[in-house]
Regions:
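Catalytic strand-loop segment that frames the active site of acyl-thioester-processing enzymes
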Residues: 1-40
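A broad structural signal for short, well-ordered beta-strand segments within beta-sheet-rich domains
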Residues: 6-11, 63-66, 105
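Generic "edge-of-domain/loop-turn" microfeature
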Residues: 8, 26-28, 39, 76, ...
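Aromatic-residue hotspot detector
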Residues: 11, 71-73, 95
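HotDog/MaoC-like acyl-thioester-processing domains
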Residues: 13-15, 86-116
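Hydrophobic beta-strand-centered segment that forms part of the acyl-chain substrate-binding groove
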Residues: 50-89, 103
Length: 116
């Protein structure tokens, strides 16, 4: 629950299927991951996907499955993350997390389900 609130607080804007997040230096996950060399943990990146998909669908969502995840660059303190969903024919979504220049931080192929 704490993670959900922290991720929701990072939300800045939405343009169509693109969601803008600013990850501040005081984001709670940076304290322990890793001291002296902070980066946003993969679980937080997946949490951003669920948070954004909830905004898109209008209902609270959680990740049902991740069939592939690729982490290309670390998300550091004070980063801006643009998250976009691309629907796939198999019912899953390609979630791409990029910076303002379009350089990828990570991408996940995932499916969602309504949270209980």
């Amino acid at each position: 629950m704490l993670l959900e609130k922290a991720l929701s607080a990072c939300f800045s804007a939405q343009k169509e299927n693109r969601f803008l997040y600013h990850i501040p230096a005081d984001f709670p996950a940076f304290e322990g991951h890793f001291p002296g060399n902070p980066l946003l943990p993969a679980v937080c990146q997946m949490g951003l996907c669920a948070e954004a998909f909830s905004r898109q669908s209008g209902k609270k969502q959680e990740i049902a499955a991740v069939s592939r995840a690729k982490f290309m660059r670390p998300i550091l303190p004070n980063s801006t993350v643009i998250l976009a969903f691309i629907p796939r024919p198999d019912g899953q979504y390609l979630a791409e997390l990029t910076d303002e220049k379009g350089q990828k931080f990570s991408q996940l192929i995932c499916s969602f389900k309504e949270a209980l």
